[in-house]
Amino acid sequence: MDVWKEFCLRVWKWFVKKPRVVDAKRSSEEKVANRYSPERMKRYLNAHYEFRYNVLSEINEFRPKGESLLGFKCLGKRELNALCLEIQSAGIPCWDRDLARYIHSTLVEDYHPFTLYVQELPEWDGEDRLVDLASRVSSEAYWVKYFHRWMLALLAQWMGKNTTYANCVSPLLVSEEQGWQKSTFCKSLMPEPLQAYYTDQIDLSANGRLEGKLGVMGLINLDEFDRLTSRGMAKLKNLMQLSSLSIRKAYQKNYAPLPRIASFIGTSNRKDLLDDPTGSRRFLCVEVEHRIDCSNINLPQIYAQLKAELETGERYWFTPEEEQEIQCHNEAFYQIHPEEELFRNHFRSALEGEACEMLSLSEILEVLKEKHGALLRNVSMVKFGNALVASGVERVHTKLGNRYKLVRVDADE
């Protein structure tokens, strides 16, 4: 009897304990299945989406896999949370912090918008489109030639070629007529994929922030150029000559080198917009002939042409001789100051071999003040001297300082 009881007890224990073993095994398997696996998460993401990191905006972007016609969208916090929930719905354990750690790592390939645009340009079909593009503004041969050169410098800047010769020349579209689409033309030079890197909002008093724009923007429009102050103009000329930048980004302690991308273009409703003759070589002034037609501009082929020309060694910088020609051409766009008008009434430049006086700036101004004292207050000696040289007056360096070779004339001549 005891033997029978013992047998029944063993059988009962076996039936009671077996489910527990099975349940324990099942629980263990579920724990393994529910354990976070970065590889499963990455496989899911790479199977369903494309990711990339924009090195200019420092923003992650994504789009559905295989949807090449769709543009990439910014991957913000809301999109990141939606992705996390989607992965969890697919039965894959995922925490938002783990997903963010992956997305914000070097495992996501980075890209440069301008480099990518140039790489994806079509082959040039051989048709010259730069003449037509320039002629939409003016058919003047001078403008057509140098606008082409400037466009080469613009693309060279985007391609990273312009490290020695910064694109330090800016076209200025001038028209006293309103509504001739000067600003629209400037913006239409920016390809659609790069429109985010065009701006006409510029504050020349914001030093560091403005230099930062040179490393991010592709084209900066100096809209209403004639409103710039003298201080702003000096700052602008300095910025235009920078070929490389040293920028400290937000939340970083150290400065880092940054290549310059930006080129400048500008518009004006006034013709007398330049006040520094020696610095005018930085501005390619053109008077707009008519309302600009901004339709049907084939930018892919225009930039494909420029790319092909650069790859065959076409020069993209302006020579000193070309800068001198630009400076001479810009005489029609100078501001004429009172002291210059008065000077022309009483002096002229001496001809070669002609008897003349050798006068200093102070001596010239003393003569003018005797006759027109009230009109000659706060005259800038430097600007006045530069204006004389720009107008053709010969300047001679002597032991007593600079002297100007002049002949006196009557105001009525």
Predicted regions and their residues:
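N-terminal nucleic-acid engagement/recognition segments and initiation subdomains in replication
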Residues: 1-127, 141-145, 374-375, 413
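P-loop NTPase catalytic core of nucleic-acid-dependent motor ATPases
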Residues: 102-210, 214-215
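AAA+/SF3 P-loop NTPase mechanochemical coupling elements
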Residues: 210-215, 249-267
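Conserved AAA+/SF3 P-loop NTPase catalytic/coupling segment centered on the Walker-B
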Residues: 217-241, 274-279
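Conserved catalytic/switch belt of AAA+ P-loop NTPases
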Residues: 234-256
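Positively charged interface segments
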Residues: 252, 290-294, 356-413
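A short helix-turn-beta junction within AAA+ P-loop NTPase domains corresponding to the substrate/partner-engaging
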Residues: 274-292
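Conserved alpha/beta core segments of nucleic-acid transaction machinery
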Residues: 312-355
